[in-house]
């Protein structure tokens, strides 16, 4: 048991230090700190000296502390709902219960809703009635865009090697002081695919295809929050959860969410008033809800 504990802690530390920069270490980076806590306690129980028992108990406390203080899967409190609301949902591939999906979207009533694998939901009467006669659902590759705000641009950016990215520009001048450009992203989930190579490929495409200014990047990245690969794709954006997260943070899988693989990254000029996840009651992913505000200089000018 002591050997297993040492190996487990060693692999976990490798994942913390090297993250997913290498294919071999990315497996280690998926080890949740909280999984190490019971392992360390078992090692403490198996230790043959008081000193070793104390040592393993301290390591167990450290892993639990890391989980709650660094990984921060839970944050108390509530944010403000007075702002531009954005929902991202990586939907299931199941098309058999479109009305249930649509009802959840309508009930949420976000200003901007971006779906991955939206498929038949966008054609339901529930969605069309909710949007009203002056708006329509937009299909953009893997993605569905639902909003009553003026959509200024829908642009394909990347689609190959199971890497999908699209640019969406929406006129939010009244709400945020300027339009926002959103990069909707869906990246491979295969565990053996190098996350670092995926990130490098997407970053290269963004540069070569002149993606322009990106204010928000969102979607199913299949990378953990804090991933080195994730940070390398959009180095100028920060995680909305880091700025204003509340409640339970992980988004997958829905029944027992342990990992945050769906992300909303935002530019510094945007104010983040709240970032939460919610259980839609269907599918594999929790939904992400973000409340945004404009920059301070815009607010000051309006006053």
Feature annotation, model-predicted:
Residues 86, 92-106, 117-303:
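Soluble catalytic domains of enzymes that build or remodel membrane lipids, polysaccharides, and related
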Residues 1-127, 296-298:
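N-terminal, active-site-proximal structural segment of metallo-dependent hydrolase catalytic domains
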């Amino acid at each position: 048991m002591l050997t297993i504990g040492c190996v487990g802690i060693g692999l976990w530390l490798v994942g913390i230090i090297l993250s997913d920069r290498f294919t071999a270490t990315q497996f280690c980076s998926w080890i949740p700190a909280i999984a190490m806590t019971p392992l360390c306690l078992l090692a403490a129980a198996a230790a043959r000296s008081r000193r070793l028992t104390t040592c393993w108990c301290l390591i167990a406390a450290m892993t639990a502390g890391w989980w709650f203080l660094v990984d921060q899967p839970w944050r108390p409190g509530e944010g403000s709902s007075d702002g531009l609301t954005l929902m991202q949902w990586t939907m299931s591939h199941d098309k058999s219960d479109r009305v249930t999906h649509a009802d959840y979207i309508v009930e949420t009533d976000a200003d901007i809703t971006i779906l991955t694998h939206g498929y038949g939901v966008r054609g339901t009467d529930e969605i069309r009635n909710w949007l009203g006669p002056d708006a329509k659902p937009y299909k953009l590759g893997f993605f569905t865009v639902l909003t009553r705000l003026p959509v200024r641009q829908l642009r394909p950016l990347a689609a190959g090697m199971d890497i999908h990215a699209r640019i969406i520009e929406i006129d939010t001048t009244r709400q945020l002081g300027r339009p926002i450009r959103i990069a909707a992203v869906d990246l491979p989930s295969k565990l053996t695919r190098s996350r670092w190579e995926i990130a490098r490929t997407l970053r290269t495409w963004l540069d070569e295809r002149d993606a322009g200014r990106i204010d928000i990047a969102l979607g199913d990245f299949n990378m953990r929050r804090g991933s080195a690969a994730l940070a390398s794709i959009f180095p100028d954006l920060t995680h909305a959860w880091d700025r204003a997260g509340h409640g339970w943070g992980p988004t997958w899988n829905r029944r027992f969410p342990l990992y945050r693989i769906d992300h909303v990254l935002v530019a510094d000029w945007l104010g983040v008033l709240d970032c939460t996840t919610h259980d839609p009651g269907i599918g594999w992913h929790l939904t992400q809800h973000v409340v945004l505000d404009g920059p301070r200089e815009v607010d000051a000018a309006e006053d």
